[in-house]
Design a protein with these regions (language model features):
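Basic/polar N-terminal segments that are highly enriched at the extreme N-terminus
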Residues: 1-9
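Intrinsically disordered, low-complexity, positively charged segments
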Residues: 8-67
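Glycine- and acidic-residue-biased ligand/ion/polar-headgroup-sensing regions
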Residues: 44-60, 69-95
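Short amphipathic beta-strand/extended segments with alternating polar/hydrophobic composition
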Residues: 62-65, 99-103, 142-144
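Short acidic-glycine-tyrosine-enriched beta hairpin
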Residues: 93-110
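Short, charged beta-turn/beta-strand-edge "cap" motif at the junction between a beta-strand
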Residues: 112-116
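Surface-exposed beta-loop interaction hotspot
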Residues: 117-162
């Protein structure tokens, strides 16, 4: 298991208007989120947001605190939304197991000490995309399945990103 992160600094809005495609991609595009048995993150100076991806293949991946958080564990002062965009898997948070299918979401509130990601089938691994922000209050963890989700389909399938 490997945890990687990079820090992205905010761009001056006036300067950003003059950026070419290469510079825009360098400053804003996040690539390589899903690498087998890695947790990859970008810590952004925009609202101290963390965007990341975890793709467990045959082993459990731990969501570790990264240096910019200056915290003993990842959710010490943060909350996180986790979305499965791959095969079936599950997330464990402080002993509670949340099975997650494709397009299902999990909210974990501030304070969960140990969070791990696992895939049900290494041949079709789960891909957990997550966004985390600072939290100033604690709310209960909650799994939203596809059956429970409020769905709104707009446009046509050919011209959308369903």
């Amino acid at each position: 298991m490997k945890t990687n992160f990079e820090i992205r600094y905010a761009s001056n809005p006036i300067d950003a208007k003059s950026y070419d495609t290469a510079r825009l991609r360098k400053d804003f595009l996040i690539e390589k989120l899903f690498v087998a048995n890695e947790v990859n993150m970008v810590y952004s100076m925009y609202d101290r947001m963390v965007v990341g991806g975890a793709m467990p293949v045959g082993e459990s991946l731990l969501l570790e605190a990264i240096d910019p958080l200056k915290a003993p564990y990842f959710l010490t002062r943060r909350e996180i939304g986790i979305f499965n965009v791959g095969g079936k898997g599950f997330v464990k948070a402080d002993g509670e197991t949340y099975p997650m299918d494709y397009k299902e979401a999990l909210y974990l509130g501030r304070g969960d000490r140990k969070v791990t990601f696992e895939s049900l089938d290494p041949e079709h691994p789960a891909k957990f995309y997550f966004c985390s922000s600072p939290a100033h209050a604690t709310y209960p963890d909650h799994l939203t399945t596809r059956d429970e989700a409020v769905k709104m389909e707009l446009g046509t399938l050919e011209e959308s990103n369903h």
